[in-house]
Curated annotation (Swiss-Prot):
This is Phosphoglycerate kinase. InterPro entries: Phosphoglycerate_kinase, Phosphoglycerate_kinase_CS, Phosphoglycerate_kinase_N, Phosphoglycerate_kinase_sf. It comes from the Bacteria. Monomer. PROSITE patterns: PGLYCERATE_KINASE. The modification Phosphoserine is found at residue 183. Its EC number is 2.7.2.3. Disulfide bonds: none annotated. One of its GO terms (molecular function) is ADP binding. The modification Phosphothreonine is found at residue 299. It comes from Bacillus cereus (strain G9842). ATP binds at residues 201, 292, 323, 350-353.
Amino acid sequence: MNKKSIRDVDLKGKRVFCRVDFNVPMKEGKITDETRIRAALPTIQYLVEQGAKVILASHLGRPKGQAVEELRLTPVAARLGELLGKDVKKADEAFGPVAQEMVAAMNEGDVLVLENVRFYAGEEKNDAELAKEFAALADIFVNDAFGAAHRAHASTAGIADYLPAVSGLLMEKELDVLGKALSNPERPFTAIIGGAKVKDKIGVIRHLLDKVDNLIIGGGLAYTFVKALGHEIGLSLCEDDKIELAKEFMQLAKEKGVNFYMPVDVVITEEFSETATTQIVGIDSIPSNWEGVDIGPKTREIYADVIKNSKLVVWNGPMGVFEMTPFAEGTKAVGQALADAEDTYSVIGGGDSAAAVEKFGMADKMSHISTGGGASLEFMEGKELPGVVCLNDK
């Protein structure tokens, strides 16, 4: 990575404004999944050990520019203190006199959590005045919020106009892993693209067709490709306005020598529920009033075989409606194949794929699970991320 990280700067005694991603799911004031807090710990601990005054900023939920009581970061600060085993202070605002006083009272190695930055309308507008207010609290800006790196907001990008800007350790790892995958992949390189909609994955498929050896398609978006081949798909998801594009992608794969894998059999159902009756049919045999909801067993075997023989696999998007037990087997099989593959480096591209490997207890078997769904998607589309572009070059 050609951007400076916290390892490249002197931090002792410095006030560090560190943008983290503490956007954790909450239920009745309790954190239901603390993965993102844990992911930020190495950076926070490094800053503490180096004798920095650590000022943490994050968003939580979508308060839309005003204070919302249940979206305060108070429970997050409390949990962070437990995880760090030290006292963590919490400010009730993200800038201004109260925050400044609390920062002024900090000693080296102290940690302070600012209030939810999205309580201020200027945050999502990347307002220069708000960015200046944030910058006034600190000497250095650290961006460790890969999950928000595709956003040009005041605390993720704007602040870098007023302070030296470097990446945290999590951001650095994300950029290294994803960057290496796209620029210098070990081969065979396989991408698995799933999820519901073709339109969400157009950029990724287009960009990856230039880079991969194998492209595996699954999830709801597969049926648009199936229909493009002339098959009936019953009531399965389909984007009729993307059929020509699907044909174009399949033609491109052929021209570029990319192996393009699609389901050969599918799990179908007449009702969308936990207790649904399902059948397995060939891809060209979906009855008119049934819908495809998962990849079938033959497809799972083919996909698992491709995975096993790959050196690098990037997975973005589930193979079926994995949240419901009868439609989860395809996604589980792909996860299991990645978990079992001995010589394969597996990169899970955040979002639903990450949720799936967590749900099936396979997370510790994956080489890298990205902490940013939208950010990793845009990175894989070859787009520049505002929260990365703004960092100082080495």
